[in-house]
Amino acid sequence: PLPLMSAPQHIYIGTDSGATTSKINAVWDNEEPVSKKVFQRPTNSQNGTEAVINGWIESVNIFLKDHNLTWAQVDGVGLAIPGPYQRYGVLDRSANLPLSFAGWDVHEDYSRALAKAAGRPVPLVMGNDGQFGGVAEARYARKDTKHSVLMLMPGSGLGCAYIDQNGLPIPGDTLASMEGAHMPAPLQMLGNIKP
């Protein structure tokens, strides 16, 4: 008799989109990382929303190929992207993204692109990049304790997250978590900067 072949392990893809760089990685269904190296590419937000979506899909395809994985193994995708949001899945005006991105239903567009690439619907969950990063890092920082965690993540802005004692974030009214930067500033009061 032929030896029993084990079924391929399933994965969950993470897409972390910043204003300038997007990152891709994945975890196995046992929550272990597929790779300890994050795959990074330019976001290309200056080229519009379609270019961003196409870049994410191309990046996922490269990641899958580089790790001998297939779309059939992808059980879900998470998208971390800066806020604020008009509502779940729809971006609002963000200081570090083009004005044309306000009102973009990124959840709908990415869901459609994922389904086309996979040949079937792929569950997609999205949220604020600071919030998602905070939940992940708090899990490691807290270990088995019941402490709250405040996380500050500098990038093109300052992503922030407060994670409560139960490991849950505070999303806020605009689902932007505790976005700590990209706030209006009186430039004339910051030294030699003219408004």
Feature annotation, model-predicted:
Residues 65-68, 119, 167:
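Short, flexible coil/linker elements and helix-boundary hinge sites characteristic
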Residues 45-54, 73-76, 83-150, 188:
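Glycine-rich phosphate-binding loop and adjoining helix at the ATP-binding site
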Residues 16, 78-82, 127, 150-157, ...:
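Short beta-strand segments
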Residues 7-11, 25-29, 33-49, 102, ...:
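Glycine/GP-enriched mid-protein hinge/lid loop-to-helix segment characteristic of carbohydrate kinases
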Residues 20:
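Conserved Rossmann-like nucleotide-cofactor binding loop
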Residues 33-72:
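N-terminal phosphate-binding loop and adjacent alpha-helix
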Residues 1-4:
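Short, Lys/Arg-enriched N-terminal segments with co-localized hydrophobic residues
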Residues 25, 57-65, 106-112:
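Short, well-ordered amphipathic alpha-helices
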